[in-house]
Amino acid sequence: MTERTAVVLFTRDLRVHDHPALAAAVSAFDRVVPLYVLDPALQKLSPNRTRFLHQSLADLREALRKRGGDLVVRRGDPVAETVKLARKVGAEGIGLSADVSRHAHRRERRLRAECDRHRMFLRLFPGLTIVEPGALRPAGGDHYRVFSPYFRAWQGVRLREELAAPKRIRLPEGVDPGRLPDPPKGDSPDAAEGGESVARRRLTTWLPTLGRYDDIHDDMAGDDTSRLSPYLRWGCVSPLAVANRAGDRDGPFVRQLCWRDFYHQVVAGFPDLSTTAYRRGAREDWRDDPHALEAWTEGRTGMPIVDAGMRQLRAEGWMHNRARLITAGYLTKHLGLDWRPGLEVFFRWLLDGDRVNNSGNWQWVAGTGNDTRPYRGFNPVRQAERYDPDGAYVRRWVPELESVPGKAVHQPWRLPDETRRALDYPPPLEVPGADPVWLR
């Protein structure tokens, strides 16, 4: 009897637990080829994410080897390399996780055309979100534009069954697994390590604090958030598994997971979210000020809470969610600069950088996106005093101000002249028009 073979193409689903495409292939086929194709074009976008990716691939390879298989690694055009390997091993077809980005859709179209040409199947599976994009549709539309009704509908969905990791995986004989390059250095010295095993340990360690999530997640100095976002972005942990471990679908933490699903279904219906204002008629009279953009990027705006957030981003490849809101609001609402360059800076540094969630969040803050109040502004001083009341977060990331006590650190321009002159810290950036209320 001829043994049946299938290829599973990994993309941003770098795990063996709750991986529908992998589980289906192992169940239906005698031999399975887990494959990842390193795309040189994508590797250049973010040294931080490239390092995290390579660490995650090494962890995935180890998990597959423990189960008798291996991760086959190739380098080049993902479609060409996948089809080439599938034909070489005599695969009947290819399975992979469905995705919503333009890049993913282009890959899918090309794969489908090649599979049709070579008489192979191409099957897409869920797994990148908890509820599949497109599974929920409002009356008269192809996607929800406002979060609250989406969340209500999302809460009522019967979720798919969470899948165990395969016990055994068998590769075809003679397949060269290929070399996985050593992880590159990356740009952020304190960036988290990638991999499913790291993600599962982090989730287990953090879960005991879940009951206090609503009280502690905005404490910038305490930093008691899950920090799971890079692992969700790369699929090192299943969002369904995280939701199941959290339990309460009405709770504030699971609500944040739902926001992730929400933006995936938005991008499925509006694929230009990373480049085009979502809100029809949105005003976009942005200023052009390269000096201000550079100062914001480097964390030297003279606004301590903003500079602290941007320096954390550069040091860790991650930023506290409250700091993301403050820094993005400062760029767009105070400096009056376009959200798109801000998005690109985040995308360059963030381990969890992706076009779906980052774009949705930036547009929300800028007033051009979903479920937004276009004239909402973030007072950075008020935000700092509320979420970093003693200034510990600022002093951690802006050492020039470590001698400034208490909440005075949030407004160094109000210090006595002699004290202020002794600090190696710039004054707040000047912008055209009247000074905002927090500088008066």
Regions found by a protein language model. Give the residues of each.
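Trp/Phe/Arg-rich N-terminal binding region typifying the photolyase-homology
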Residues: 1-162, 249, 311, 357, ...
